[in-house]
Amino acid sequence: MRAILDAHPDVRCGGETMLLPSFLTWQAGWRNDWVNNSGITQEVFDDAVSAFITEIVAKHSELAPRLCNKDPYTALWLPTIRRLYPNAKFILMIRDARAVVHSMIERKVPVAGYNTSDEISMFVQWNQELRKMTFQCNNAPGQCIKVYYERLIQKPAEEILRITNFLDLPFSQQMLRHQDLIGDEVDLNDQEFSASQVKNSINTKALTSWFDCFSEETLRKLDDVAPFLGILGYDTSISKPDYSTFADDDFYQFKNFYS
């Protein structure tokens, strides 16, 4: 998603800062220590936090009319970021937890709270965090949009148009060929764990990359350890689900508040 946005001539996201998720966690602790005990008001603290974030986002790559940032799990801090940037808009990317967990394990991605040697605990963690992020996104109407990975790669033109409309951006054909703009419009941070994937064109191969990678015992437990999968519309009844329903024209008509 980040590379697709970066391909737009009016947008610059740049590579993952790999700093802001930790900073957002730290500032929560600082608020308790300083705002409550030293006379520093929330407004003053917010100004300081937003100034730091703005400097990082604005200056870690070239300027553009519209700036964006993509760092894993920053959506967990959506209420705070909305307060700091009341005119900002947010995209919550949603993907099948089985693909997410497989990707973390396969690429050895270090994400706080995820123990890659314990698959079940990873699904539990995903369930908790996605539920929280989805709830927070749903409570930011007009500011936050949910985008399903499985729909984006099957209906890229339609979904990208939906996204640009939400962001009040003109549609750009360049967004459909972000891979051709790597190193030009699209900058990569070689330390990003997703760098190798970003270099690929939009394709459906990743949909089934997790097939045959989990034991039947693990898959049978999903409804208990990650029930939010079903709420989001993912089929947990079979080991190799068909994602074609995510490409249906009426896909969004059957989405409830939680999904």
Swiss-Prot record:
Disulfide bonds: C13-C68, C137-C144
Purpose: Catalyzes the O-sulfation of tyrosine residues within acidic motifs of polypeptides, using 3'-phosphoadenylyl sulfate (PAPS) as cosubstrate.
Reactions the enzyme catalyzes: L-tyrosyl-[protein] + 3'-phosphoadenylyl sulfate = O-sulfo-L-tyrosine-[protein] + adenosine 3',5'-bisphosphate + H(+)
Name of the protein in its database record: Putative protein-tyrosine sulfotransferase
The organism of origin for this protein: Caenorhabditis elegans
Enzyme class: transferase
Lineage: Eukaryota, Metazoa, Ecdysozoa, Nematoda, Chromadorea
Record-level Gene Ontology MF annotations: protein-tyrosine sulfotransferase activity
EC number: 2.8.2.20
InterPro entries associated with the record: P-loop_NTPase, TPST-like
Site entry: Transition state stabilizer: K70, S194
Transmembrane segments: none
Domain of life: Eukaryota
